[in-house]
Amino acid sequence: MAKNFDAGVWQQKIDTTQGSKKMPVILEAIRQADEEEEHYYRLFFRYLYAYEATFHDDPPKAMPVAIEFSTIFEQYPDVLGPDGGEMYVMIMQMAIDPIVSLPQIPFEQWQGMIEQYYKLVKRYNLGHRTYWWQMCQFYVYLDKKKAYELFERFWKTGRDSMSDCRTCDRCHAIRMHLLIDDEEGANEMAKPIKSRRMWFCHDTPHLMHRDYIEYYMNKGNAKAAKPYAYELKGMGHRDKHDLSYMGAVIRCMTYFEPQIALQFLEQGMEWVIGIWDCKLAYDFYKSAWVLMHHLSKTQETISIKMPPNFALKNDSDIYNIVDLENHYYDTVKSIADSFDARNGTDSYNENFKLAMMEPKIIE
């Protein structure tokens, strides 16, 4: 090992660094491993970076390091030992997963990338179930019927070491049943999660709560969404990764406890500006518009602390609510238009229209 590179020191730095400061530390570890041509750690730290981006930060940031990982791994396929193939498939999965959330990547490019990913799946005979979920989650915005057919392929395919946890899989099933308005099927899938008879990972039961909130709010039934929002508000605001969960809480709490919605908005604004993941941004900004639109009916201004890079930032942090409402509308509409242009559908704009409707049932 090169004397200028101490992997143990870097691992300790990474382990003891929390929050948004961790990603730059891992990048510096990658840079030094590259300089010293420590190929094991060039790969290992890239894997750590992709994992951190995927589960605690901005998922698309996993993509560049995953491509670099692929290049290095193909040159040095044995350096990671017997687990190398699994790490390779996993990091490429983390690179494929965010594409659905990046409207600037054309559908045809996604098709090419998912085909290459499937070749990797077959090469190592790992991740077949996950492959079908990747296909499914993209087609949700293109063709709901085909998306559900792909989900059925996913559900019937055997699990392996690449699979999400069983609770995540059930959350995926809940989402797909709600997508086709099969509330009874979703509720059946949700039973062991609601009774807490399953192990929970970083994203569960958050995914279930978010999808039920969105489903009921889209139906105009804030009363039915309320218990899920109260559950989610206590768990879903840890970091950038949670912006979609925060958006769901804001949207529902607007009609029950707008002060809580404002607290979530203020916290999330620190994370959402400049984020690569456009779906996280859409979910958050959509609900920010809902909140401002609702508040504009009863007051003209609002005091809220905004980050320095907010487009309408002023020294007093007192804002005209209609100005905020218009700003969020323009932001959401721009994101929705970009997704729909890429997907060749109107699913995002139709989703925004549902959010713009006042709930019919509140209490």
Where are these regions (language model features)?
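Generic helix N-cap/helix-start motif at coil->alpha-helix transitions
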Residues: M1-W10, Y40-F44, M87-M94, Y124-W133, ...
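Non-membrane alpha-helical segments in proteins
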Residues: A7-D15, E28-R31, Y40-D58, G84-V100, ...
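Helix-turn-helix repeat elements of alpha-solenoid scaffolds
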Residues: D15-E28, D58-Q75, L102-Q116, Y139-F154, ...
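Solenoid-like repeat scaffolds
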Residues: R31-H39, S70-V79, Y117-L126, E152-D164, ...
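Residue-level recognition of tetratricopeptide repeat
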Residues: Y51, Q137, R175, E214, ...
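Solenoidal tandem-repeat scaffolds enriched in leucines and small polar residues
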Residues: E115-E188, S195-R196, H206
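Active-site/pore-lining binding-face segments in mid-to-C-terminal subdomains
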Residues: A224-F310
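C-terminal non-catalytic interaction modules
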Residues: E270-E363
